[in-house]
Swiss-Prot record:
PROSITE patterns: RIBOSOMAL_L23 (PS00050). It comes from the Bacteria. It comes from Streptococcus equi subsp. zooepidemicus (strain H70). GO terms for biological process: translation. Belongs to the universal ribosomal protein uL23 family. This is Large ribosomal subunit protein uL23. Disulfide bonds: none annotated. One of the early assembly proteins it binds 23S rRNA. One of the proteins that surrounds the polypeptide exit tunnel on the outside of the ribosome. Forms the main docking site for trigger factor binding to the ribosome.
Length: 98
């Protein structure tokens, strides 16, 4: 698996924004990725970033309805990345930097 295919997108929720103040970043990652691979992908994608720890959460599929038909959303995996104290911050929102 290519390192740049591991991270899909950042998770932008109220809970993840509070964790951002503590230096914890939340990303949706490939379901086949393990913690060491996620750590390598984050350090390769963002310059000057050192990862202290990686916590992962498997998100179960939710039942959704369209009219009378029921189906399920896809299962996903979230990774909560904690950076070291001497690490650079990850620039998630480029508009804030301007």
């Amino acid at each position: 698996m290519n390192l740049y295919d591991v991270i899909k997108k950042p998770v932008i929720t109220e809970k993840s924004m509070y964790a951002l103040e503590e230096g914890k970043y939340t990303f949706e990652v490939d379901t086949r990725a393990h913690k060491l691979l996620i750590k390598q992908a984050v350090e390769a994608a963002f310059d000057g970033v050192k990862v202290a720890s990686v916590n992962t959460v498997n998100v179960k599929p939710k039942a959704k309805r369209v009219g009378r038909y029921t189906g399920f959303t896809s299962k996903t995996k979230k990774a909560i990345i904690t950076l070291t104290a001497d690490s650079k911050a990850i620039e998630l929102f480029a508009a804030e930097a301007e």
